[in-house]
Amino acid sequence: MQTVMTNSGVELRVESNIIYTTDSKAFWRSGNMLVGNGTVVSYQCHSMDEAVDMVAALYNGRKTEAAQA
């Protein structure tokens, strides 16, 4: 399981093809679609890494390693 902290303080937990957030939302990949909250976030999502980056962008981006320390 991968975890990513965002600049807005929300933590993303990645399990298989689902991304859970600490504000009780979930996003998942289905083919090349990234779906979350009942809407399509992207039709051109080609990997889970790209999906995590897109979801993190919804929360003002990833917190950098230096900022986490």
Regions found by a protein language model. Name each.
Residues M1-I19:
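Negatively charged, low-complexity tracts enriched in Asp/Glu with abundant Ser/Thr
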Residues V4-N7, T22-D23, V40, E65:
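N-terminal compositionally biased, intrinsically disordered segments and leader/signal-like regions
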Residues L12, A26, M48-V52:
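Short amphipathic alpha-helical segments that mediate assembly, nucleic-acid/protein binding
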Residues I18-T39:
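Short aromatic-glycine-(Arg/Gly/Cys) micro-motifs in beta-strand/loop hairpins
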Residues V35-A69:
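Mixed-charge, Lys/Arg-enriched low-complexity segments
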